Structure formats: structure tokens, C-alpha cells
């Protein structure tokens, strides 16, 4: 990148510029970022040609943003991306072959050779804290402060807090009662009506609150599990059938040989003295 277009920045200013420029690029739809998995974490990656095409096009308007450099060539855009790499904003990755046929997210692997060819892929490493998380942190701090000042609360607020705590304990108690009741119901129906019925089958599943109570009931084995068991039984029968068919053939050959021995005509053999 030409030094006339970009001012000389200190280390702190370079870091701030990298964060601002990264947030700007992440918000641009021209990059067409896609979700993927890198080291077990969900990340977003993009192609080099898309970011270079955007930075050298008319869609990139640096005059609207203070401190953004003017970019007129591919080399200048690459220099800006190198600055982002030096500040750990992005890193080059390679796609791994899929482990399954229908894999939802692509798995990535870091490539140490930080080059900028058109078909190469890069991942955003910089993830700023969302405003929602910061708001929740402030709210949590205020709640803790309010609990610490509980002795200074007026009497009506203390009574309200006591009623709320009792209501929360009641909800937790009802949840445990529901878990015990559905277990007893399953044990009874497993004996009377096999394979058994579960009340609120998704109650303990890793789903949302509303989905935990859908459906109202279901059988112990789902349709997919029943199909799998049937297929396994069919495969086991097919595997055992050749061995079973092979044994009668052996027995039939042995019986035919015995019959031939029985119906053979008597013969006289000469014995040399």
C-alpha cells in the first residue's frame, strides 16, 4: 500500500484501526461470509477474491469513515489485509474433506502460509462483545448490588422478594414432581402397553422451553429406532441363513453316501497267498 495514502500509525493506533476496519468488513454483504467449524468453534470464513474485489471497487467509500485509507490497486488492499493479520484479526484456513456425506458445516484447518490468492479462504478471529452481552453484564451487576443492599429495602419490597422466592421454589418443586410422575407412568405402561409411553418426552432434552413440552406424549421407541431394529433383525437373519442352508447339504450328502453303501452288490476279492 502506498505510504502517501495511509498515515504512519503507532502500535495502539494500528490495533484500533484494525478493529474498526474488521468490524466494517464483517458488516459488508459483498464478502459473502459463510459459517464453518474451526477447532470445535463456530466461525465465519470468506474468499480472498471477494474482499479484494470489494476494496478495489466503487462500493468501498473510505471518505465516509475517518482514518480509512484510499485503496486503488490489489497490492494496496493486500497490505491492509496484512495489517489485519499482524493484529490477529483474521487468519488463512483450508477446507477439510467432509467426514459425512451430508455435513451441515465445513470443517477448517489453519494454514500458516498467509498468502493472498483468489481461491484462498480466511477466517475472522476478532469477535467483539455484542451489546446485548454488555447490557446483561451491567444488569447482573445491578442485581447483585441490590441483593447486597437487601437490609435497606422497605418492608413491601422484602415481602415481594419473599413471595417471588417462594414462587420460584414452587416451580422447581413442580418440575421435579413432573419428572417423577412421568417416570412412574413409563414404568406402568412399559408393563401393560409395550414399549411404554413417555409423558413430555422432550422434557429433559437439550431444546427450548416451549419445545420441552411438545409433544404431550410419545412411545418409548420412535419410528426411526423401530426401523433400525427391524433392519438389524433382517440383516442378522440374512447373515445366519447361509450357514443354516450349508448344514443340510452336508447331511444330505452323508445320507446319500450311506444309501449307496447299503445297495452296493457284494463283490469277491482274491487274496494272494
Curated annotation (Swiss-Prot):
Query: Which keywords, in A-to-Z order, does the entry hold?
Result: Endoplasmic reticulum, Membrane, Protein transport, Translocation, Transmembrane, Transmembrane helix, Transport
Give the location in the cell. Endoplasmic reticulum membrane
The primary location reported for this protein is endoplasmic reticulum
Annotated segments matching region Disordered: 225-273
InterPro entries xrefs: Sec62 (IPR004728), Sec62_asco (IPR011553)
List the GO cellular component terms.
endoplasmic reticulum; membrane; Sec62/Sec63 complex
Transmembrane segments annotated in the record for this chain: 133-153, 168-188
Q: Which residue intervals are topologically Cytoplasmic?
A: 1-132, 189-273
Q: Which residues form a coiled coil?
A: none
Q: Where is the composition biased (Low complexity)?
A: 238-259
Q: Which residues lie on this side of the membrane: Lumenal?
A: 154-167
What is the membrane topology here?
A: Multi-pass membrane protein
Q: GO BP, one example?
A: post-translational protein targeting to membrane, translocation
Q: Where is the composition biased (Basic residues)?
A: 228-237
- A Pfam short name: Sec62
State whether keyword Phosphoprotein applies.
Answer: no
Into which family does the record put it?
Answer: Belongs to the SEC62 family.
Could you describe the subunit structure of this protein?
Component of the heterotetrameric Sec62/63complex composed of sec62, sec63, sec66 and sec72. The Sec62/63 complex associates with the Sec61 complex to form the Sec complex.
Protein's job:
Acts as a component of the Sec62/63 complex which is involved in SRP-independent post-translational translocation across the endoplasmic reticulum (ER) and functions together with the Sec61 complex and bip1 in a channel-forming translocon complex. In an initial step, the signal sequence seems to bind simultaneously to sec61 and sec62. sec62 and sec63 are required for interactions between sec61 and translocating polypeptides.
- What protein is this chain from? Translocation protein sec62
Its taxonomic path starts at: Eukaryota, Fungi, Dikarya, Ascomycota, Taphrinomycotina
**Gene that encodes it:** sec62
Amino acid at each position: 500500500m502506498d505510504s502517501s495514502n495511509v498515515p504512519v500509525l503507532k502500535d495502539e493506533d494500528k490495533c484500533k484501526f484494525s478493529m474498526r476496519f474488521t468490524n466494517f468488513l464483517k458488516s459488508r454483504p459483498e464478502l459473502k461470509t459463510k459459517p464453518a467449524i474451526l477447532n470445535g468453534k463456530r466461525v465465519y470464513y470468506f474468499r480472498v477474491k471477494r474482499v479484494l474485489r470489494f476494496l478495489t471497487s466503487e462500493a468501498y467509500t473510505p471518505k465516509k469513515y475517518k482514518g480509512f485509507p484510499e485503496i486503488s490497486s490489489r497490492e494496496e488492499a493486500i497490505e491492509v489485509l496484512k495489517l489485519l493479520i499482524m493484529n490477529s484479526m483474521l487468519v488463512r484456513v483450508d477446507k477439510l474433506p467432509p467426514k459425512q456425506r451430508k455435513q451441515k458445516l465445513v470443517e477448517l484447518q489453519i494454514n500458516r502460509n498467509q498468502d493472498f490468492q483468489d481461491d484462498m479462504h480466511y477466517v475472522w478471529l476478532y469477535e467483539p462483545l455484542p451489546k446485548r452481552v454488555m447490557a446483561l453484564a451491567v444488569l447482573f451487576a445491578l442485581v447483585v448490588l441490590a441483593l447486597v443492599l437487601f437490609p435497606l429495602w422497605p418492608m413491601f419490597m422484602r415481602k415481594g422478594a419473599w413471595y417471588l422466592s417462594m414462587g420460584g421454589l414452587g416451580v422447581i418443586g413442580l418440575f421435579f414432581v413432573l419428572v417423577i410422575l412421568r417416570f412412574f407412568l413409563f414404568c406402568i405402561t412399559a408393563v401393560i402397553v409395550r414399549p411404554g409411553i413417555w409423558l413430555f418426552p422432550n422434557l429433559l432434552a437439550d431444546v427450548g422451553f416451549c419445545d420441552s413440552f411438545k409433544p404431550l406424549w410419545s412411545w418409548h421407541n420412535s419410528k426411526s429406532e423401530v426401523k433400525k431394529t427391524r433392519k438389524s433383525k433382517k440383516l442378522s437373519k440374512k447373515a445366519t441363513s447361509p450357514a443354516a442352508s450349508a448344514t443340510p447339504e452336508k447331511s444330505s450328502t452323508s445320507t446319500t453316501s450311506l444309501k449307496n453303501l447299503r445297495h452296493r452288490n457284494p463283490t469277491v476279492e482274491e487274496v494272494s497267498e
